[in-house]
């Protein structure tokens, strides 16, 4: 169950369905393959098999868990580099420590988001705190990679610490859905995330049988990924369930519904909605680097091998730039 919730959604601002917007059709629904990341924690590759023209400016997204760790089981990632894009780590339940070679770092937990702009490059590490390793416990989150346009790929690294209590909370007209706006704008309400590439990121919880039709910028793409539960998407009511991604076509609104009966282990439909303005530039992606050309990729690897992306360990405990 997501950590950020409210007892009575009807106390929140309500998002009404747009009166005359063209409904976005569902182009495809894909199923995320499972794998392992870092030191061996389980992930689902949410965007596997989706053509990049439907994802742009998003690059990849991994759902981490949901998993109940036994003592000694929690795992993270070792120190590794990034350049040319942003990582967005959203912890739905659980806790994670992180540190980077630019002096940023801290702990994110229960609805918090770490928004890291790698820009010209840095090193970072993500790991469960020692207390979680010793005791075990619930862990569930996701990590999204967002591309940067060529003009911003070599900008100075930046870090934002977005606390769960600061996300914009909204609801549907009947209170059947809780909408957490992490970044971007929805019906005049702004999320706290500062984005270099215009995007929207929303975590929606729909009660059984609930439906939402949201206004959606026509210059954005549209994606819906199911974290847990069962439902349908689009006017055509295309079925969708845990670990699946729906790709929407053009239009001014998108619709998600929760089935009346949910899986026994999850009471609601949990879905992440993403939209972004396509960058429409060449992309060269290999491992932890996302650039525009192969030469730029080679330069990134050379800079990393020569220590130009930072040193380990970084000074920890500094106030991160852009904390929210």
Show where each model-derived region lies.
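Jelly-roll (double-stranded beta-helix
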Residues: 1-324
């Amino acid at each position: 169950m997501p950590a950020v919730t409210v007892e009575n959604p009807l106390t929140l601002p309500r998002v009404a369905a747009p009166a005359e917007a063209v409904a976005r059709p569902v182009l495809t629904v894909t199923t995320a393959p499972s794998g392992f990341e870092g030191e061996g924690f389980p992930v689902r590759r949410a965007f596997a098999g989706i053509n990049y023209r439907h994802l742009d400016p998003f690059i990849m997204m991994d759902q981490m868990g949901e998993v109940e760790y036994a003592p000694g089981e929690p795992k993270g990632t070792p120190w590794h580099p990034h350049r040319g894009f942003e990582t967005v780590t959203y912890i739905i339940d659980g806790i994670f420590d992180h540190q980077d070679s630019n002096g940023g770092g801290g702990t994110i937990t229960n609805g918090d988001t770490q928004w890291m702009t790698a820009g010209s490059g840095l090193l970072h590490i993500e790991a469960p705190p020692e207390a979680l390793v010793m005791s075990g416990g619930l862990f569930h989150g996701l990590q999204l990679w967002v591309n940067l346009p060529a003009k911003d790929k070599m900008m100075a690294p930046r870090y934002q610490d977005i606390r769960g209590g600061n996300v914009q909370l909204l609801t549907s007209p009947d209170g059947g859905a809780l909408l957490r706006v992490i970044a971007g704008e929805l019906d005049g309400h702004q999320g706290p995330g500062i984005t270099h590439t215009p995007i929207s990121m929303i975590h929606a919880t729909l009660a059984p049988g609930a439906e939402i039709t949201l206004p959606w910028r026509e210059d954005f793409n549209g994606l819906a990924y199911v974290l847990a539960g069962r439902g349908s998407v689009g006017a055509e009511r295309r079925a969708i369930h845990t670990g699946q991604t729906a790709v929407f076509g053009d239009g001014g609104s998108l619709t998600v519904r929760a089935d009346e009966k949910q899986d026994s282990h999850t009471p609601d439909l949990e879905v992440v909605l993403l939209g972004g303005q396509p960058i429409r530039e060449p992309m060269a992606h290999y491992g932890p680097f996302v650039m525009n050309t192969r030469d730029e990729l080679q330069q990134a690897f050379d800079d990393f091998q020569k220590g130009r992306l930072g040193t380990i360990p970084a000074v920890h405990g500094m106030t991160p730039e852009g904390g929210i």
